[in-house]
Amino acid sequence: DRALALNANDVRGLFWKAVAMGKIAEDSGMLNALRLIRSMEELLLKVVMLDETYENAGAHRALGRIYHLLPGFPISFGSNQKALIHLQRAYELFPKDVITRAFYADLLYDQGQKKEARHHADFVMSAPIHQEDELEYAEYVKIARNVASKTNDRTVKLGNFIRFQE
């Protein structure tokens, strides 16, 4: 908050405040989470406006995930249409981003686009991940494996968690 008090348009401060709010929302009850998420949405929309490429289009990616997972009206403001707009844009900007591709696969599957969802899930599952990044990316690989397991093609590529020798 102090950094943003000095510069209300600091993309880094806006983005990471939104991320922190998201983590708090995950750990709080449903009502508190819904209150935090609206403020988080505002911060992320501002990041998109100021620099949509920051953190590999992290604001687009986060907004896409929020809109996809939240219930729609009248309970909340979830919207698969908005989710698709943001995740498509994140994918256009950073097509090799594992997190974006995992979230995109999940959304596409839920929208009935199973073949396209599987394509993105396969990308995530075959992406080389350094040993030191395994824990960070495990959640996204799990999302991709879940999408893959729900598609008709029962073959699951297991190219992840390659240990690089340096």
Predicted regions and their residues:
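Short coil turns that delineate tetratricopeptide repeat
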Residues: A8, E52-Y54, P95
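Conserved structural position within tetratricopeptide repeats
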Residues: L4-A5, V48-M49, I85-E92, S126
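Terminal, low-structured helical/coil segments at or just beyond the last alpha-helical repeat
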Residues: F77, D110, R118-D122, S126-E166
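TPR/TPR-like (Sel1-like) alpha-helical repeat modules
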Residues: R35-V48, G78-L84, Y109, K114-E132
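TPR alpha-solenoid repeat register
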Residues: G13, N56-A59, T100, E134
